[in-house]
Every structure is written in C-alpha cells, then in structure tokens.
C-alpha cells in the first residue's frame, strides 16, 4: 500500500516540478533553499575538496536548461558498504528526532551520537573567525592530498568522533579486491567470516520543486551485479525505508529506478543549521551546502561510506 501511495505522490510531484518556475533569487539564509546557480557553486566546492565526486551530464534528452550541460548532477561510484544496517548496534540513547514538533513526526537520526551525523551539534562551535575561508581537514586520504595544495587559513573546529570508516588511498574502490577478500573469508569457513561488502553509485541532483539537492543511490553485490530493491533497503535505516527513502526514476538517467532520499525536509534541516551557526556568531556560506547535506543524510544510509567532510573548519 505504501508503494502505491509513493508512486502516486511521485507522479504528482513530477507534474508539480514541471510547473514550478526556476528559483532566480537566493533564499538560502531565509528558508534553506538554493537556486540552480547556488547548487552548481556548492557542487564545484564539493568536487574540489572531494574529487571522488564528479559532475555528469546524463541523457541528452533529459538535460535541464536551468543547469549547465556538463553540470547536470554529481556522481560518485563504487562506494563501499561493508555491513548491513541491522548489523549496527542500536541503542535508544543514540536516537534523536530533529524537528519533532512538525506534522510528520520529525527527521529520525538513528545514530545521532555516534559522530556520523552530529552536524547540528558541531555547528554550534563555529565562530566568525575566518568564516569565509573554509577547507576540509579529513574528507578522505585523497581529499587530504588535495588539502596539501591549499594554503588558506582556517580556524579550528572540534573534531567529530571517528565512526570506524575504512581509510583508503583509492579514489574509487577496486571491486576485484573485494571479491578476492570474500573468497578468502569463505575459505576460512563460517558464515560470520564472509565479508559481505557491497558497492553503491551515489548521485546528487537539483530538485526544482523543492529547490534543494536530492540524493539517489543504486547498489551492487560483490560480483558487481545489481542489488534488488529489498537488498538495497537492508543498507538503509529502517526508520526511513519507504518513508524518507522511496524508489523512483532518476531524472537524468535511464531505468532501472533507484533509491532516493526524499527532499521534502532538506530545506527545513538546513535552515535549522543556518540558525544554529548564526546563534554561535558565525555565518554559513551557501557553497558549504552539499558538504553539510551529505553529513545529515548519513543518518539515512549509515553504512554506506561515501566521500564527505568528517572534519571541516570555518
């Protein structure tokens, strides 16, 4: 029944998006939404600091006129996912509801205190000092190499707790190594010894109706065979399956449909973060949008280890 409702909603939103005019004037600070131009600026900032993310065009017939042809959406491929969500130790103490007084019951952050998605707490430490000069401290090993070339100053910010993410010098994961590792584990015997590593392709598009970024993902098994929808749901927080996360067609690519994190709450969450930064005497630049966006959607896909800023300063 929920799938039917999501399908009907999806079709209605497609029509609404088509009829919605393109946002021309910036309303980022007031409402948390962004223009297509601001989306491109934030995307350029993400690509600069995390080169595993790249701009893409998609199908020619699906190019959106309000975005540059070569910058229709962002993509990162072969992102590792080492375990299923049910394998993560759950505790009520780790759960938090963001904006719980809204009609939908709020955004559930299942791993709120683990350091994976502590963005709303961390931004309280941001100050006015060097607020316009931002750089990453630990996006990944590759991002660190990029930072060696950056000479801009940046004020320190309290580091997030490490979440046990596997560091790698590779921009993308070599799935052949995963297969070899799986075979070795299988030979060792025992179901628990098997490395159940999957990989995901992630995409960020601009949603004209909600005027925010939108995250899409599609997964593969160890043999690089596409995962079924039910298998992909295993890597998504169960608080968000079929609610925040639905199955829809990518706006720039051909089928099959992908999992998508619905953007209806993105502007609200971003507005809350902007206000929190302002309360601390800081100012959040729109070019930081996607770095922070990737931070808070990690609550939805906590085991997919994509390239984003775990440590950043302002």
Swiss-Prot record:
Changing residue 23 to T: Severely reduces ATG8-family conjugating enzyme activity. Reduces of about 40% protein membrane interactions. Does not affect formation of the covalent thioester intermediate with MAP1LC3B. A motif (Membrane-curvature-sensing motif) lies at residues 4-19. Changing residue 8 to D: Significantly reduces ATG8-family conjugating enzyme activity. Decreases protein membrane interactions. Does not affect formation of the covalent thioester intermediate with MAP1LC3B. A motif (Increases ATG3 translation efficiency by the ribomome assisted of EIF5A) lies at residues 101-103. It comes from the Eukaryota. A motif (Caspase cleavage motif LETD) lies at residues 166-169. The active site is at 264 (glycyl thioester intermediate). The N-terminal region works in concert with its geometry-selective amphipathic helix (AH) to promote LC3-PE conjugation activity only on the target membrane. This is Ubiquitin-like-conjugating enzyme ATG3.
């Amino acid at each position: 029944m929920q799938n039917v409702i999501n399908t009907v909603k999806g079709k209605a939103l497609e029509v609404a998006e088509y009829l919605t005019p393109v946002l021309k004037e910036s309303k980022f600070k007031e409402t948390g939404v962004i223009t297509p131009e601001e989306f491109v600026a934030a995307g350029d900032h993400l690509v600069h600091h995390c080169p595993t993310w790249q701009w893409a065009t998609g199908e020619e017939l699906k190019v959106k006129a309000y975005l540059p042809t070569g910058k229709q959406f962002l993509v990162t491929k072969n992102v590792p996912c080492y375990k299923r969500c049910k394998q993560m130790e759950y505790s009520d103490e780790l759960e938090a509801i963001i904006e719980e007084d809204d009609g939908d019951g709020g955004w559930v952050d299942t791993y709120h205190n683990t350091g994976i998605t502590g963005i709303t707490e961390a931004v309280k430490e941001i100050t006015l000092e060097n607020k316009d000069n931002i750089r990453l401290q630990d996006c990944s090993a590759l991002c660190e190499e990029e930072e060696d070339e950056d000479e801009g100053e940046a004020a320190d910010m309290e580091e997030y707790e490490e979440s046990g993410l596997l560091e790698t010098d590779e921009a993308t994961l070599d799935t052949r190594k995963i297969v070899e590792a799986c075979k070795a584990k299988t030979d060792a015997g025992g179901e628990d010894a098997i490395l159940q590593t999957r990989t995901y392709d992630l995409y960020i598009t601009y949603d004209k109706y909600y005027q925010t970024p939108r995250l899409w993902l599609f997964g593969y098994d160890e043999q690089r065979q596409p995962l079924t929808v039910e298998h992909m749901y295993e890597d998504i927080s169960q608080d968000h399956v079929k609610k925040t996360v639905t199955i829809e067609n990518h706006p720039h690519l051909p089928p099959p449909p992908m999992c998508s994190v619905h953007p209806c709450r993105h502007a609200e969450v971003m507005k809350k973060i902007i206000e929190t930064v302002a309360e601390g005497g800081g100012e959040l630049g729109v070019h930081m949008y996607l770095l922070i966006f990737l931070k808070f959607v990690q609550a939805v896909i906590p085991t997919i280890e994509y390239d984003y800023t775990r440590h950043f300063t302002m």
